[in-house]
From Swiss-Prot:
Expressed in heart and kidney. Aldosterone binds at N764, Q770, R811, T939. This is Mineralocorticoid receptor. Residues 1-602 are annotated as: Modulating. Residues 776-779 are annotated as: Important for coactivator binding. It is a peripheral membrane protein. Zn(2+) 2 binds at C637, C643, C653, C656. The lineage of its organism: Eukaryota, Metazoa, Chordata, Craniata, Vertebrata. The gene is Nr3c2.
Amino acid sequence: METKGYHSLPEGLDMERRWSQVSQTLERSSLGPAERTNENSYMEIVNVSCVSGATPNNSTQGSSKEKHELLPCLQQDNSRSGILPSDIKTELESKELSATVAESMGLYMDSVRDAEYTYDQQNQQGSLSPAKIYQNMEQLVKFYKENGHRSSTLSAISRPLRSFMPDSGTSMNGGALRAIVKSPIICHEKSPSVCSPLNMPSSVCSPAGINSMSSSTASFGSFPVHSPITQGTSLTCSPSVENRGSRSHSPVHASNVGSPLSSPLSSMKSPISSPPSHCSVKSPVSSPNNVPLRSSVSSPANLNNSRCSVSSPSNTNNRSTLSSPTASTVGSIGSPISNAFSYTTSGASAGAGAIQDMVPSPDTHEKGAHDVPFPKTEEVEKAISNGVTGQLNIVQYIKPEPDGAFSSSCLGGNNKINPSSPFSVPIKQESSKHSCSGASFKGNPTVNPFPFMDGSYFSFMDDKDYYSLSGILGPPVPGFDSSCEGSAFPGGIKQEPDDGSYFPETSIPSSAIIGVNSGGQSFHYRIGAQGTISLSRSPRDQSFQHLSSFPPVNALVESWKPHGDLSSRRSDGYPVLEYIPENVSSSTLRSVSTGSSRPSKICLVCGDEASGCHYGVVTCGSCKVFFKRAVEHNYLCAGRNDCIIDKIRRKNCPACRLQKCLQAGMNLGARKSKKLGKLKGLHEEQPQQPPPPPPQSPEEGTTYIAPTKEPSVNSALVPQLASITRALTPSPSMILENIEPEIVYAGYDNSKPDTAESLLSTLNRLAGKQMIQVVKWAKVLPGFKNLPLEDQITLIQYSWMCLSSFALSWRSYKHTNSQFLYFAPDLVFNEEKMHQSAMYELCQGMRQISLQFVRLQLTFEEYSIMKVLLLLSTVPKDGLKSQAAFEEMRTNYIKELRKMVTKCPNSSGQSWQRFYQLTKLLDSMHDLVNDLLEFCFYTFRESQALKVEFPAMLVEIISDQLPKVESGNAKPLYFHRK
């Protein structure tokens, strides 16, 4: 049974008796782990001292080659490298003093062991005050000063240093683990020396700065990590330096050293090192013949920690940790300057392993060396690994980040310690934030080499003659009443099956393949593009077929029927409802149709984010305010009226910005009509009052209650389908609104002075551009293509001036409220320009028509139908080839105008009166057109002399119309007799 003995022998006992007791004690302590119990480790105070010059195997290396670090309190002369016979008495007296110190330190250990330490305590005072701790040290120092102590030389170097290591399991129950460290059996020239207070190169041990090194896993700082055997290189810890792993013990700053992470049950209870040994190694005085070394290292509760440092004898030149004879050339553990942790290993010889609390480094790890781990204190993944003597793993810690949750961020998936790694826990490494898990992108994005085609109904990409009416009109297309059962995309929709079973009929190189989607946008596929591509027709061959965008009613009704494959179909961008649930209200359907998936609105003028619909166009607030103020000014462009207007450059040119606003369709009258629409909606939303109940007969005295029938699902769907059918059925007014020509720019050059010739030439060029738009508009007019081509050309030739002047009056009414003549966004006539154009009276006549629009508050639906009637208002006297078709078409549009007038909330009398005023306005256009044609014919004849230019389109029309009008072959159609 292992016991704990404290030797306090009287001072006058014989020295030989003490040496024999020491030998017996050490022999009794050398029992194996099987002969020990779970009691605390046997404690003996071992004081090992040596002369720095004692190097048995290399005596030529004297003290002159060494730098000795002297204790500040012991300024002794260390020049002597040998031991005199007269020093034996001094050695015996020092042994007696060591026994006294051992007794006092044993009492100190009992007090410290019973003390309770908190977990986070760093500088807590133990049961023994610092004064008492220092008192023993002071007595020892005094004794050395009085007696002129000299350390003895270890004469028997070949004798093994017997040390003892208790079973590490003895500290499992919370007791303080005192690891008895074994030193190498044979110490030769490369082994670190066991130094006396005079020659201790690896520690500074004055009472003012005693370094009781305690490595802690919580802080590495700038202090080295110490093994349980040696303290490493010299390190002076001043009182001002605070380190969780190293404390300064002086009379002022003396404290019981405890690990900052130690638990209350397993506190670090290491004795304070005495000045001669400066370690927690408690040993009797070393014998020249037999130096049994026994270091007591305290490790609290699996704390991988070292408290003391003991240098083995010989070779004081080598500042290294305790090493095996084969690995003694390793440098120090750490330096406060470099902060580099270099670990050494100790080899095992003759069955006595040298135990070090160090991680083997790849440079010093040798074959045959095995390491015994000390228990660790940190919990990794809530698993405590208790070191056992048989295990070969070294438990060293690198303090992780405060979060502690580094299991998922470490490279390893487990906590297995790699023997070849200097760290037991894998070092945390941040994952790359730029790593990509997907496959790399293959191929370059296709670039569209073709500009986005205009989405309007009119395109200038026809292969026909631009300056020929017959060329523009071309072959007839299906009329308004034609069937729309066919596909809405004559060129076919691009299909790309995955199996590659479809191939185009013609063999075309992949680099020349062009696809056109339903919106008219072209796509150019690069060479080597995978997948099959169906060829669409060329944009030049596309003929305008607006009617294909309006589905027939029967097709719409059929789409409501449930189909098995309806969910897998695509509806060309329009959602197709499979069924209508019973409990779905109109507000729910409205919220679904106007969901968050709709793209954000963009200003049609500058491209900025739109704030709403202003003056009839979706624009931003900036363009709204600009248009409101700009219509009152006459801006001039410093360039060629083609400035870029976008979000950044919209303020550069107000003329081009106003021109773009007008081109987008902004007008001041839209605000008034919007207010009228709101008032109209309020009248319509007023609930109708239920009819009063029938008067009750007093004779009968009975009350009749009308039978109420709850609507079923079918009866509720029928009116909904009927209303949807009526709403989606394209009316002529809806079609006319969709095919309305866009505003054309005149290309007016304001840098030149305004003259009659330049203004008239500009008006003629503008009229030529507008005529192209008029011909294209008439080509898609419902019912107009049913007429023979010759009749179509004749009607356009007779009515072109009437259509141009009527459209001018509408633009002036919408954009300037009939204050100016709005020929184009870049050409607006005020009074001055009217005089300069040499046609002031004609301009005033056209302005009067525009003022009539203001008086009647003409709507766009009325205007569009009236314009069609003006196209059909002049015919040859001999009549047309298909007069019947012409009469039918004209009658249909007159009826449509009548319906449009009756839609107003006015009474029937007021609607007829409005119809009369509108038709009267149409009749007044003939008188104005006659005057305009007369002036036009005159300038056409005298164009050479007047230097007035006429475009090719007008030359063709006027050349055919002039002889017919002058011969009286033109017959205007009036609604009212003069």
